[in-house]
């Protein structure tokens, strides 16, 4: 199994090779074959709709409907994929140092480039007004508050360090995010003014994962050397 995704209603999706699978409730497994190895999976925030990222685009699939899946093309290898919380945009992290997106109302393309390295971690801020990303020596936040998303706009850059961001996680309710870095540093950052709180001093190994609890009262981190931490707010 290469990828997994969970739906708030309890459905689960996973992929193996070129095939994506979905199981919802007591229903039988349903599967979809795509043209190449699945790079990432994401459920839409409303309804049972699954985005399947792969080489040269993303396939949008309603497992419980007979309609043909919709294909969103863009040349290149698409890995992580995410819907915006308002279901208006779809964004992928690519094998190259870039993001690609589509405005779902008309499938208009959105290019988000300029990264020095591959984007391996993406997270929507509370309310979905911005998308926080790794891949640079600061957290890059692309604006999605308007109907055009980030098209024609410059991203914000917060929490710069002399080392690359490896993981990001946004607080579920407040305009706060956590950032993990290649040197093991973890910062908590307030988006309004960029104020930073040091959660974990550089420990040597890169931060591999960050996560908030559902209520936003706990922040956890894990590093590539096996170290982990839990912060209670």
List each language-model region with its residue ranges.
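WD40-repeat beta-propeller superdomains and closely related acidic/aromatic-rich repeat-like regions
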Residues: 1-233
């Amino acid at each position: 199994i290469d990828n997994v995704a969970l739906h708030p209603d309890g459905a689960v999706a996973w992929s193996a090779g070129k095939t994506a699978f979905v199981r919802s409730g007591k229903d039988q497994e349903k599967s979809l074959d795509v043209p190449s190895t699945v790079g990432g999976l994401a459920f839409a925030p409303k309804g049972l709709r699954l985005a399947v990222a792969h080489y040269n685009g993303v396939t949008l699939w309603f497992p419980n409907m007979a309609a043909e899946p919709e294909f969103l093309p863009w040349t290149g290898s698409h890995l992580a994929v995410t819907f915006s919380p308002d279901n208006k945009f779809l964004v992928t992290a690519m094998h190259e140092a870039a993001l690609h997106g589509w405005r779902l109302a008309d499938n208009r393309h959105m290019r988000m480039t300029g990264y020095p390295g591959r984007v391996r971690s993406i997270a929507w801020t509370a309310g979905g007004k911005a998308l926080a990303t790794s891949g640079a020596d600061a957290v890059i936040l692309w604006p999605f508050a308007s109907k055009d998303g980030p098209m024609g706009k410059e991203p914000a850059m917060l929490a710069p360090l002399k080392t690359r961001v490896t993981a990001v996680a946004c607080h579920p309710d407040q305009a706060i995010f956590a950032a993990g870095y290649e040197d093991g540093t973890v910062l908590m950052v307030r988006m309004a003014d960029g104020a930073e709180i040091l959660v974990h001093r550089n420990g040597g190994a890169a931060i591999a994962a960050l996560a908030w609890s559902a209520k936003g009262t706990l922040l956890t981190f894990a590093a590539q050397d096996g170290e982990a931490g839990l912060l209670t707010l």
